[in-house]
Amino acid sequence: KARDAISLKFAGSDTFHISAEFLRVMSPSAEVRGHSPDKAILQTGKRDVVIEDIQKTGNYALRIYFDDGHDSGIYSWDYLHDLVINHAKYWSQYLKELHTRGKSREKEMQVLKMFDA
């Protein structure tokens, strides 16, 4: 069953809910992050992305499968904890970057006009 968020509970903390969109745009994969910070690729149009599957990777991480085909991010427990702790900061930075580049969280629509010949 596809989900639009996951819940995480770390030892001694409350339960945190993280949206699929946030997890997708913050994917730790080289495909998203690049091989250095200046090579990161801004993720756009991910507002409606959902999680199709989650698999444990050993005892240290989760691999999350998204409905847009992205599945190369390995989310370590430390990275997930960082996302929880810094959610507001990272989300604000992401929204600012979208605005700066004139991009959107919405999928880009292709418009096709039909004409009678």
What are these regions (language model features)?
Residues 1-117:
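Motif-centric detector for short Cys/His coordination patterns
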